[in-house]
Amino acid sequence: MKETVAMLNQQYVMPNGLTPYAGVTAKSPWLASESEKRQRKICDSLETAIRRSGLQNGMTISFHHAFRGGDKVVNMVVAKLAEMGFRDLTLASSSLIDAHWPLIEHIKNGVIRQIYTSGLRGKLGEEISAGLMENPVQIHSHGGRVQLIQSGELSIDVAFLGVPCCDEFGNANGFSGKSRCGSLGYARVDAEHAKCVVLLTEEWVDYPNYPASIAQDQVDLIVQVDEVGDPQKITAGAIRLTSNPRELLIARQAAKVVEHSGYFKEGFSLQTGTGGASLAVTRFLEDKMRRNGITASFGLGGITGTMVDLHEKGLIKTLLDTQSFDGDAARSLAQNPNHVEISTNQYASPGSKGASCERLNVVMLSALEIDIDFNVNVMTGSNGVLRGASGGHSDTAAGADLTIITAPLVRGRIPCVVEKVLTRVTPGASVDVLVTDHGIAVNPARQDLIDNLRSAGIPLMTIEELQQRAELLTGKPQPIEFTDRVVAVVRYRDGSVIDVIRQVKNSD
């Protein structure tokens, strides 16, 4: 062999970057060992996986939130990182929810220095609103997160991705195993772009595990853990079916708007939100679709059991699923061939070569607040505290032909229709209709909708009239006092800054 290499060097002068052949296993040493060849990705513990990943202080770690309120990966991994002495990390989870309150101590102790997320709720949201972090949290939409990753601003060093099961080479999906969560649309983006991908799995299955949402050629390391998530808690939080008469009234009115909008025809497409009223619209649309002999071409989302029901009844031909919102959706993804998993890039990224939200006819979304310019707040409560998520709100509002916001006029003694929202997440230019329990308002820029709805005999109000009625019922709210300190920056889906969130003054 040495003689052959020497002869080759005499016959051919190697340019810079080229080296002579040195043997089958010279650059693939694992091929020399049968066990190493097949099991080189498997780690005996989470600590081993972290050490092998090459993670260092100051780097960026990422997670997905497909398990929502049942997620166990974020807290498990960050606790281990703290135990191992890591500091100044950037945490980039596709979203954070109530269950992630243990991060508070890790932020205080310097383990986490910066956060990118779509949502903040519960104790974590309260503490960050009170000034917990030195660096403002970066709030992004689901599509906007992909844009930040693709632009290089958000560069993921190590992605820790929880999956119900996988094979020893890393082929994984979210709709198999005892803890199935459904679509891994968020995780697929991280698996594609992270420098190192670590899978945390509950179960091993035989190779090859297909269909694979995350493929073997994307995975560096795998570690088995006891639990990655509780599938029973996927529906916790913002996702809820309703029997509330007020919300059902709003849903019924929203379905009427869809029916007479001009978009309700054979082959239309739709997405429903996760709030009580916006989710309930699906019930009322079913009757109208049957009565008019209409079948939808596709449903997009965030797929829920109500959408699955319409699909299995033949009323929606295809479901495009970037996140499964309940067990029925996870089951359907495994069983129904026309229930298709898509990545968040395909779902809603403005940098995508083809985002499905741009094919939407109708989207129904909820809101914490909406103002007289149709701007929508889904991030902060009436007290100015972080308690929501940007989600796909601005993405789908921008892409859909018809964006309907469903919200009560007031919640308790708090107006939902206001002069100016506390936090602008979705700009009014992409919002078309507001449906409340006291009336319907159409964005004046959509004269076509105004004409269609009036022709159908649907009474309309101006949004200013709704705002004044809300104020009459609740009184004029006392303005919230904020300090100058910015605790969060709201990024629009294209990466631009659309608003900032400041520390509430009495939270010092």
UniProtKB/Swiss-Prot annotation:
Gene3D superfamilies linked to this entry: Glutaconate Coenzyme A-transferase
GO BP terms in the entry: acetyl-CoA metabolic process
Locations listed in the record: Cytoplasm
Keyword Transferase among UniProt keywords: yes
Chemical reaction(s) catalysed: citrate = oxaloacetate + acetate; citrate + acetyl-CoA = (3S)-citryl-CoA + acetate
Keywords linked to the UniProt accession: Cytoplasm, Lyase, Transferase
Listed transmembrane segments: none
GO cellular component: ATP-independent citrate lyase complex; cytoplasm
Documented EC number(s): 4.1.3.6, 2.8.3.10
Major subcellular location class: cytoplasm
Annotated Pfam families: CitF (PF04223)
Domain of life: Bacteria
GO molecular function: citrate (pro-3S)-lyase activity; citrate CoA-transferase activity
Keyword Ribonucleoprotein belongs to the record: no
NCBIfam families reported in the protein's UniProt record: citF (TIGR01584)
Function: Represents a citrate:acetyl-ACP transferase.
Subunit structure: Oligomer with a subunit composition of (alpha,beta,gamma)6.
Cross-referenced PANTHER family: CITRATE LYASE ALPHA CHAIN
Name of the protein in question: Citrate lyase alpha chain
Organism: Klebsiella pneumoniae
Lineage of the organism: Bacteria, Pseudomonadati, Pseudomonadota, Gammaproteobacteria, Enterobacterales
